[in-house]
Regions:
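Glycoside hydrolase catalytic-domain context in secreted enzymes
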Residues: 1-254
Length: 254
């Protein structure tokens, strides 16, 4: 139980575009510039995951929230964004995600709460399959924002119940469900009803297990170089000072 509580899957960086200063989570982002956001995100992902030539990853970084998620918070569970122009989508909201997938090999992508063109992002085949996997070549893990699958039937009303939501999320490409409701617990029922095949479910389980193998969770800790870093180094004063100094130097006036 102690080991299970120490997750090596970190849900950062937030590469959403900060367009409205009233958005209360804007401080998590890298601003309103898609190029700057892309470059900062690439550096963060590479630093968190470690060198690609290593057998094991330090952590699994996560590009979030995919996509077109920039507040406000109060309407994120019900919003339907159906007026996003193709130019805004491809030149403003998607470049950072594409960069993290293709230039940083980010291991996780988190789908957002709201709907985009009538489909919830975590059940949006165009976003998760056609763009993310088919066009960009992403082959790793998609995780839902916490409670996003439950939103399918509680607030978006795009699903009739938890069983339908579980099938919709899985078939669209969301591998792991976070949060409350846990619709994916209904997948065995969905399989028994013939709504989804066990082979389809296995495909998503395999992606999850591949991530855990990449972290070395299935091997002896002595084989994983990152386990040799002492806790005295983690969050130490030298690293805090470096982070503070970097933050001071990177402030940008647009």
């Amino acid at each position: 139980e102690t080991v299970r509580s120490h997750s090596l899957s970190v849900w950062t960086p937030n590469v959403n575009i900060f367009r409205d200063p009233r958005w209360g989570r804007g401080q998590e982002t890298y601003g309103e510039d898609p190029y700057l956001t892309s470059q900062m995100g690439i550096a963060v992902v590479k630093g968190l995951q470690g060198p690609e030539h290593e057998k094991y990853r330090k952590l699994l970084a996560c590009a979030k929230h995919y996509a077109v998620h920039s507040g406000p918070e109060w309407s994120r569970h019900t919003a339907n964004l159906n007026n996003v122009s193709p130019r805004d989508l491809w030149e403003t909201y998607l470049p950072a995600f594409k960069a993290l997938v293709q230039k940083a090999d980010v291991r996780e992508v988190m789908c957002a709460y709201q709907r985009l063109d009538d489909d919830p992002c975590c059940g949006n085949t165009r976003l998760l399959q056609q763009i993310l996997r088919d066009e960009w070549g992403f082959k790793y893990l998609v995780v839902s924002d916490c409670g996003a699958i439950a939103d399918f039937w509680t607030s978006h009303k795009s699903s009739s119940d938890a069983v339908h939501a579980a099938v919709k999320g899985t078939m669209a490409g969301t591998d792991v469900e976070c949060g409350y409701g846990y619709a994916y617990q209904k997948l065995p029922e969905a399989v028994s009803k013939g709504l989804i095949t066990e082979e389809e479910v296995d495909k998503h389980v395999l992606r999850l297990m591949e991530g855990r193998f990449e972290l070395g969770e299935m091997d002896d800790p002595s084989l994983v170089n990152w386990t040799k870093i002492p806790m005295s180094v983690v969050n130490c004063k030298a690293h805090k000072d470096l982070s503070l100094n970097m933050s001071r130097q990177t402030m940008t006036l647009l």
